[in-house]
Regions:
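Short glycine-/polar-rich loops that comprise or flank the Walker A/P-loop
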Residues: 134-136
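Active-site-proximal helices and loops of the catalytic beta/alpha 8
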Residues: 2-97, 101, 118-120, 128-132, ...
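Surface-exposed cleft-lining segments at the edges of enzyme active sites
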Residues: 111-115
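A structural signal for short, well-ordered beta-strand segments and their strand-loop junctions
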Residues: 28, 104, 138-141
């Protein structure tokens, strides 16, 4: 949500210099908008903007939004369930490089994918899609041990410490026993 807040021309110049100095370094810009056309305009070499951002990777909030709606829907029509995700991916042609778009199902600013529940089937399906689609997958810590929580009361509910590693922790996810 913050990348578009900065001076676009200054950021484009900064990214050009960074890319020249470190050509194998990747920078991801957070553009919290759920429409692919808007997000694609921020990716390097986009034809949708009159200023080349030189930003190699952008975050796929469209995928995040659609997969989180789809998890609560049946795929029984053209516009709901996994068809909702498919309909969003149809806009990949807008991105200069869809393989450099970073996709995710949750992060530190959102509810956990599991919310306050434990629907592991939906989580497994979402992760299977995330890890096999033409994107850079981003995994948020704790997903692998089924951490849940919502931002209903506080952001702290989705930013809890990973279980283990500190004296007094009831569970230690760093061990086989968990």
């Amino acid at each position: 949500d913050t990348y578009p807040y900065a001076d676009r021309e200054a950021m484009a110049q900064w990214m050009a210099r960074l890319n020249k100095e470190y050509p194998n370094f990747n920078t991801v810009g957070e553009t919290w908008v759920t429409e692919p056309a808007y997000t694609a305009a921020w990716q390097k070499d986009s034809k949708l903007s009159n200023i080349n951002s030189n930003l190699k990777s952008v975050m796929d909030f469209a995928f995040f939004d659609r997969i989180n709606q789809a998890k609560n829907e049946e795929t029984d029509g053209w516009w709901n369930g996994l068809n909702r995700v498919y309909n969003g991916l149809c806009y990949d042609y807008l991105y200069p490089n869809p393989a450099s778009v970073m996709a995710f199902i949750e992060n530190h600013d959102t509810d956990r994918f599991l919310g306050n529940g434990n629907d592991t089937l939906a989580l497994k399906q979402a992760l299977a899609l995330l890890l096999t689609m033409n994107r850079i997958p981003q995994l948020y810590y704790g997903t692998e041990v089924l951490m849940n929580g919502t931002k209903e009361k506080t952001d702290g509910n989705v930013r809890k410490d990973f279980p283990g590693g500190f004296a007094g922790d009831k569970h230690n996810a760093f061990t086989v026993e968990g």
